[in-house]
Regions:
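Amphipathic alpha-helical dimerization/coiled-coil segments
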Residues: 2, 10, 14-16, 93-116
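Contiguous, function-dense segments enriched for cysteine-driven chemistry
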Residues: 11-13, 72-76, 87
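A cross-family signal for key residues in well-ordered alpha-helices
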Residues: 33, 66, 97
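Canonical helix-turn-helix DNA-binding module
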Residues: 44-75, 80-82
Length: 116
């Protein structure tokens, strides 16, 4: 291991502590990523089709992300039906950015390790 790898490892652990560890699950990461990409938001059924997991699993993860202030649940009336869709908040974008930066450090570390 060289000096650069030591610095990257140190930074990986420092950045990891900046991430809300309860948010960093694959499902929550994918939800935040999808909602950051689809800026107009997505409905529950659209998220379910993308993730292919149970309604309960999606619902509990959406509820958690809503309570944390990372996403908003919005209502829209269409043909006398109330439709709900989810959008990412600024806090959600910031948390996603922290996760992506942390993952980029790990990728950099793996690249350094493979180059030896």
């Amino acid at each position: 291991m060289n000096f650069n790898q030591d610095e990257i490892i140190k930074e990986v652990f420092e950045k990891k502590n900046q991430i809300n560890s309860n948010t960093f699950t694959i499902t929550r990461f994918i939800l935040l990523t999808l909602l950051s990409y689809f800026i107009d938001g997505l409905q529950f059924r659209e998220l379910k089709a993308s993730l292919k997991i149970s309604d309960g699993n999606i619902a509990s993860n959406l509820l958690y992300l809503t309570k944390m202030g990372y996403i908003n649940k919005n209502a829209l009336e269409f043909d006398n039906k109330k439709l709900h869709y989810y959008t990412i908040t600024e806090n959600g974008k910031e948390e996603l950015k922290k996760i992506l930066n942390w993952m980029e450090l790990i990728k950099k570390l793996l690249g350094e390790t493979n180059n030896e």
